């Protein structure tokens, strides 16, 4: 069977899918056309049902649930891994964030959902690709920005400061891991096929962990601007046991996020 598969070029995703797409494991006759795109593009594609299997932000899951099913493997959940709100200078009162122009990495992202949960009255948002946000803050194009991925490791080097850890805010309020990104598969495939894909992704993650901390050429080739230490930070932060299987705790966290979505109607 042949599938279209999309995920991001970020080290956590290439680490997870390397063994699967490069046939380092037995793919049991399953083959893939692979699309590597930023998460906002993948979110948009999911809304138009472009791909059979895709990484998405959990923030877009409520919108695509009628056409896609969430798989239990390959995703990113965790603690201490959430988005950060950063600026050029500290502020005295976080309430002033409501009056600021804020850069956010995409409308249908978990980052936007978490920001909206913390600052429901902040309406002056500019939606940018995640790697453009630091520059927008530094140039003064926006007053502050919500950063994700490797920018969590680089903002201090650029002289920026953290205003609030949105992930910590989530954990404090809701006492569960943060669902950041998940893997979805079109509902047109039967449960048996979905389970096979889920199992293959699980095996791919397990294979990657067995060979870690080696950084493969596949991971390195899609993260050429990063040092290997930053690649490992990225993997260590976003790939864990929840990536192998959501389990009961992970599934409860996803249900919590869906409840928050309904309450905030932020996206």
Question: What is the predicted function of each stretch?
Answer:
Residues 38-40, 46-62, 129-130, 147-153:
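Beta->alpha turn/N-cap motifs
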Residues 27-41:
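A short beta-strand-loop structural module common to alpha/beta enzyme folds
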Residues 70-93, 170-188:
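Hydrophobic/proline-rich hinge and linker segments of small-molecule sensing/allosteric domains
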